[in-house]
């Protein structure tokens, strides 16, 4: 019984780990020279760092358990969270600081607290999928909270287009952050020593030790279908490699041209849209921000946030301090094609606007990372939001789009990997017998 997995990010490796642990013959194909995908690393001034910012929360039980089973330690720290609102910087790290937030009246703050508590009491997300985010947020938390808080935050996260989002998105974010606070109300987050790349590398070692085969620099060119409509395997530069089941882990736009036309037809129209990201990562000599992350509701600063991960990551691990300046963009944004020099100059200017003590000569080294298709966006009122795992006999389609109703994070990806692997194990004997009969 052989399974081919297309994609060597956390999802593909997670599926491979579950399958190999169950005794399934696994072969994984990664187009890049390194495993990890969006969770992979890069080198900034000779030091390995996460390409994009990642953290672990106290509720990420699957990630914590996996890291510990691989012998990796996690460094936990209480964190500060800031806001940049109407040209002013303020802390929103504890409930008391929320009460002092200058952009809202006391009745707004009471409604905000009630809204967060209400989100925690809602367990069924399906009715929220049918409600627009603005309609629901205005009704539940009031017009002023929508206009002063939610709308500007969504604008920065979704590059101005959030009118089609379901209420589920805001509900999910509130539930994730509410369960990660200490007794003082501060968010607690963790960093894996060595970054997510260490998790990726150790996971790959485990898969190989169980007999799994992993190929890097091995882009899959095509997934062909038999005359009966069954997936035959994968076509790489070396030709066709047959498998009983093929599992893809890419988002739909990244599968175009790879799937047989019959598989594309079986999948039907994609109900999702996708966000890209442009992210400046810089190693700096000293701390830039008193916060782990700053939320920006003043849209005169057109970035999503400034994240100083060395409030969690030990500065000794990266020989300095580390800031990420992300901007989520539409997949057609011209920012995706701008030069790294232009992006660096502009984004560092925004950092200076938020933190006037920041000096350009504090930057040791920097790099701009981009991804045209980085995150799926689920919209309100659609059918077949999450299709069956198997799109056709022998073809399982998995991606980060399956995390819904959660937002995309390591814990949710680990859950998808476990679910998809379970489906493959349940149906693999059927596809194996079909292949033998053919």
Locations of regions flagged by a protein language model:
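N-terminal Rossmann-like FAD-binding beta1-loop-alpha1 element of flavoenzymes
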Residues: 2-28
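Conserved Rossmann-like nucleotide-cofactor binding loop
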Residues: 11, 34, 253
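Glycine-rich FAD pyrophosphate-binding loop
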Residues: 20-44
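Mid-domain catalytic core of redox enzymes
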Residues: 22, 219-337, 341, 345-358, ...
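Dinucleotide-binding Rossmann-like beta1-alpha1 core, especially the glycine-rich loop
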Residues: 45-127
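Short FAD-binding loop at a beta-strand-to-alpha-helix junction that anchors the flavin cofactor
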Residues: 322-324, 387-406, 412, 416
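Internal hydrophobic alpha-helix adjacent to the cofactor/substrate pocket in enzyme cavities
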Residues: 413-432
